[in-house]
Curated annotation (Swiss-Prot):
UniProt-recorded Gene Ontology molecular function terms: glucosamine 6-phosphate N-acetyltransferase activity
Protein's gene: GNA1
Disruption-associated phenotype: Short roots, disruption of microtubules and shrinkage of cells in the root elongation zone.
Catalytic reaction(s) noted: D-glucosamine 6-phosphate + acetyl-CoA = N-acetyl-D-glucosamine 6-phosphate + CoA + H(+)
Organism: Oryza sativa subsp. japonica
Name of the protein in its database record: Glucosamine 6-phosphate N-acetyltransferase 1
Enzyme Commission code(s) on record: 2.3.1.4
Location relative to the cell: Endoplasmic reticulum membrane
Amino acid sequence: MEQPLPTAAAEAAAAGGDGEAYRIRPLELADISRGFLGLLNQLSPSPPLTEEAFRARFEELAALGADHLVLVAEDAATGRLAAAGAVLVERKFIRRCGRVGHVEDVVVDAAARGRGLGERVVRRLVEHARGRGCYKVIINCTPELTGFYAKCGFVEKNVQMGLYF
């Protein structure tokens, strides 16, 4: 049987308040046929992913339980996905073995932008991280997106650096 990612904690994070047009819910295996990979490709163009590779990664993330949550916004009329985002909970030694939420891979389909879907997905991810006991939630973004994330309650802090392979 197909299970959403990751479980009941994800359902709590996704529940309520999104009206009739879109339902925000955890990622499911069947979402590969609802446009999930095409949606991610709008964020970061990538080579095609096979269904087998998608299934393997889905199962790997599901094994992490509530420490990794992928939410999607599903169009109630068409069943297609219009937005997605993820949060990963990092377990630390500092702050008395505290936890930090990392928001990643937030994307809204080009045809669905301007409807508040991105903000609703991000707010649900933040609430999930709060519920997991995170003392902060962070996101790295381009300068063009700082205004969007400010609307979601984030403030500019520090400098992001990266090393890509």
